[in-house]
Amino acid sequence: MEKLNSSKILVFGLPGSGKTTFARQLAVNMAYFNADEIRKMFNDWDFSMEGRLRQAERMYCLANLAEGSAVVDFICPYDQNRHDYDIKIWMNTISKSKFEDTNKMFEKPSHCTFEIKDYNYDNIIKEIHDKLQ
């Protein structure tokens, strides 16, 4: 991976996969956007396909407005919404969430920079931080 000074980083995966825990640890000294907090700000709790596409666009726009690197953490169930991020981190720690509708719509990524399969990810956080400096 090349040196990146101003990267848009997507941490995505099923609910309960550890996205927020990982993203908060990664986002030290970076802008950080959590989907649940953004939904609260916009009072938008629409989880239909249209609502999820709107949320994906909103999250990407917020990341682009940030100065320097930004970490966004959300399910991002559709592969088409992941392509524009510089670094894509798939939290592939669980095969199913407790939300059956989300399980059905979640598309496995066609490409990701990192695939996290367990909660031992300190080395990946360090690698990303090193590339961003």
What function would you assign to each model-found segment?
Residues 18:
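Conserved glycine(s) of the Walker
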